[in-house]
Amino acid sequence: MSPNDVEQQQLPTQNNNYNDNINSPSLNDDDEDSFFREIKEISRGRPKTRDEIQISDRTRLSRWDTPLTNDGVSPFSSIFKTLPPGLTDEQIAALILRLRVDEITKKITIGPIEFTERDRERSPSPPPTYDNNGKRSNTREQRIKEKLQKERHQLVVTAQQINPTYKPPSDYQPPNEKKTRKIYIPIKNHPEYNFIGLIIGPRGNTQKRMEKESGAKIAIRGKGSSRDGKPTKLQFQENDELHVLLTADTVDQLDKAEVLVREFLIPVEEGKNEHKRQQLRELAEMNGTLRERPAYMGNRSWTPVDIKCVQCGETSHPSSDCPLRSNESNQQYIESEYQKFIDEMSKSLGFDISISPNQNDNSLQNINLNNNNNNSNGNNNGNNNGRNFNNDTVGDMDESPPHHTQSHFQQNSPQFDQQQHQQQWNNNNNNNNNNNHNNNNNNNNNNNNNNNNNNNNNNNNNNNNNFSNYNNNNQSFYNNNNSPYGPPNGGSPYGPPRNTY
């Protein structure tokens, strides 16, 4: 047989087998379509992509692939293969969050990105946007990837709140979304109170200190936040009321900053504001004008006088203005103490000097006058050796002075008392004589003044007579000369003379 005959005999058999496979009941239309699709792709020479060939379908792994176990989990993964017993609800929730974070990380880094199977039911796509290089930046894959990243960020924040030691994936980067909060300043209720100065502090030190403690940024925004005439950047919150703007990454930082700021939004009286006093002290330290104590306290060579009221012991008022003086019982106590003092002085001096506190001032004046007269009239004191010459005769005056002088008498003796009474009587007589002499001098002065007044009156009368004679002479002069203008007032052509008297 020739080779051609052999080929002709083999062809029918192959066609028969092919027809049998097609007509067999085990093959469906879908299987047939997929079979022919694979045959065409293989015949074209294009290999299957990574998305088309699943990792689990591979029989051979490359050295870059991660070895898989029977349960499909990598041996290097931190996920538990089986849950240990005795876990709390928080631990189970943290484990579920970790599983979801790892799943999203795997989709973002390795893929594939899941698409919605129902394309007709999905929302319409947004208009396309392009970057500087002309590439589209909001493709469907990019939008799904951003959505997964946002979900992973929320899961990481929740996991860190449950377990502070949780470490996010290595490729995780938190978004730059800042949290803000407004705290309005009550400037309308207290327009004269300096809230901004208390919050900012000297050269911004108070503001910087609060930012360091809380970790949030503190700024003053709104109407009145900038000085008049100072160029500032236009802010979108300029038309808002005056407020404090807090900006932070977390809510805890905002809460800490709010507590620190609200302490300065409560008005305090001027003398009780300790925070303002500390700010002024800090500013003085910066300017170099701080004094630890007043200047007058340094070189003071005197001590203040500690004057207290005699009756109540207070330093707020003198004894004369004490409110306890109007009290009757207290007044009686003062009088009794005064009387005790007078009695003690009378015993020590040997004679009675009792003067009640309510006595008139006339007695005190008489005592002072008597003392002055005693000092002026020395002939009645030590010069005369205590003798009284009013009742002495001529023979008595020639006698020698007595042996006993004033200094030799006892204070309690009757001679001493008689001498004191005689001396007081002499002083009174001298006072009367002096008063009479002064009265005579006053009368003489009055008479002289009256004489002077009479002389002045006589001089004035003489001046008036001279002036009248002068006017009469001028009148006769004008009458004789027949002046067309007539005599002026007073008779003089230049008017009446000036009275210089």
From Swiss-Prot:
Gene Ontology BP terms: mRNA splicing, via spliceosome; regulation of mRNA splicing, via spliceosome
Domain KH: 194-261
Gene3D superfamilies: 6.10.140.1790, K Homology domain, type 1 (3.30.1370.10)
Listed PROSITE patterns: KH_TYPE_1, ZF_CCHC
GO cellular component terms, semicolon-separated: commitment complex; nucleus
Pfam family, one: SF1-HH
Span of zinc fingers (CCHC-type): 307-324
Biased composition (Low complexity): 15-27, 362-392, 410-484
Alphabetically ordered keywords of this record: Metal-binding, mRNA processing, mRNA splicing, Nucleus, RNA-binding, Zinc, Zinc-finger
UniProt biased composition (Polar residues): 1-14
Compartment annotation: Nucleus
MF GO annotations: mRNA binding; RNA binding; zinc ion binding
Domain of life: Eukaryota
SUPFAM superfamilies: Eukaryotic type KH-domain (KH-domain type I) (SSF54791)
Main location group: nucleus
PANTHER family linked to this entry: RNA-BINDING PROTEIN RELATED, SPLICING FACTOR 1
Role of this protein: Necessary for the splicing of pre-mRNA.
Family: Belongs to the BBP/SF1 family.
Protein known as: Branchpoint-bridging protein
Lineage, top ranks: Eukaryota, Amoebozoa, Evosea, Eumycetozoa, Dictyostelia
Gene: sf1
